[in-house]
């Protein structure tokens, strides 16, 4: 179990799921958690089989106002806000992706963060 700011963590997860839904017309979205190599941490992930993000996009994905395209709604702030929240929870967020195959966002946070 996690002892953390549940409201903020839920905000992060909701944003990641909404982003996955925005870029996954066909396929699936998976949400879950897994043990970390360090037993003091947990990893939460949102994975999709959507369009994927280019290497260039990955380099900028957490920058404020960055959008991978100009066709979708949003101001390009969501992932930047997610990163700020995760860092305040003393965690990290990272992304792996392959164009045409999908994307996985992973949040690694300590089990106890008050």
Model-derived features with residue positions:
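Short alpha-helical Gxxx[C/S/T] motif in the catalytic ATP-binding
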Residues: 78, 82
């Amino acid at each position: 179990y996690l002892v953390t700011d549940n409201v903020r963590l839920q905000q992060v997860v909701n944003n990641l799921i909404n982003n996955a839904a925005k870029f996954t017309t066909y396929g699936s979205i998976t949400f879950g958690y897994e043990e970390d190599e360090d037993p003091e941490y947990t990893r939460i992930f949102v994975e999709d089989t959507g369009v994927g993000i280019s290497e260039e996009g990955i380099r900028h994905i957490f920058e404020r106002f960055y959008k991978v395209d100009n066709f979708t709604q949003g101001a390009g702030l969501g992932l930047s806000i997610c990163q700020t929240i995760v860092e305040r929870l003393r965690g990290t967020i990272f992304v792996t992706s392959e164009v045409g195959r999908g994307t996985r966002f992973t949040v690694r946070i300590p089990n106890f963060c008050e």
